[in-house]
Amino acid sequence: MKKTLVAATCALLATGLALTGCKEKKAEKMVLRYAENQAQDYPTTKAAYKFAELVEQKTNGRIHIDVYHGGQLGDEKAVIEQLQFGAIDFTRVSISPLSEFEKSLNILQLPYLYKDAAQMWRVLDGSIGEKFLNSMDKNNLVGLSWFDAGARNFYDSKRPITKLSDMKGLKIRVQESQLMMGMVAALGASATPMAYGEVYSGLQTGVIDGAENNWPSYDSVSHYEVAKYYVLDEHTRVPEMQLVSKLTWDKFSDSDKAIIKECAKESAKLERELWAAKEKVSEEKVRAAGCTITELEPGEKEKFQAAMAPMYAQFGAGYEDVIKNIQAQ
């Protein structure tokens, strides 16, 4: 009888321990939120879903990430602020709004900083880029990887731009940014801040003569219909950063941190491939529509670059060595 009671007690204890273990194991699962302001079929959003999928696979389902696309959780600035106090866990944002929180990122937005895309990726995928990712720590953020957003070019409705003097007097729509407004003014044009949604009608009615953006944006909002001159000056390449809240990051084990970083790099690789494909499709569509596409001769591009001296003095102050290092890559 005693043996039977002992056996029964042991069985109950074992069952209890097993159930407790199951509860603890179940409690370990983390459900996190990823904010993305672009549409579901956009390269950055597709990369976000890939990131979530990879993390879930490599953690055997312990970490599940829900992606909220289309700006459901707020605009980029609001999302960054929510990451800082842990209300949102992951995001991808342009370094333009991010530079409001980390001023050193302005360096990466300086006009005509890079010769081409290859140089930018040598910088961002190397030790310089790693330092910028790590610099987010003091803002309660952790930088994970770099996404592509292409090169921004000028376009207008008046004339093809082949030399610096062609910029003179053009009313160019810009984002409400001191750097962007200063850049346009330094090139001899008139900087006109305007809401993005008003640009098409502004071009159509002549309130503005031109604007600036990358191939997919020029195509997707049909600005090529009312501003048919597009110059490949590539004045800025503004990369985007994939981030995690430091409050969330500190909850991960070292092995999970390694997984998160690995998945971030893989998703960034996918985003860059998708972006390149999207650029190609947009360029083909714009060219087929009969737009005039021009490029700057090397000597002329040097004049555009030289005109940026005031911008470098203002926004690069204190970071001269970093800028020289970037340009030497």
Residue ranges of model-derived segments:
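Bacterial Sec-type N-terminal signal peptides, specifically the leucine/valine-rich hydrophobic h-region
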Residues: 16-19
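Bacterial N-terminal signal peptides that target proteins for export
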Residues: 1-9
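Thiol/selenol-based redox catalytic cores and closely related redox-interacting motifs
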Residues: 133
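N-terminal secretory/targeting leader peptides
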Residues: 10, 22-119, 128, 136-329
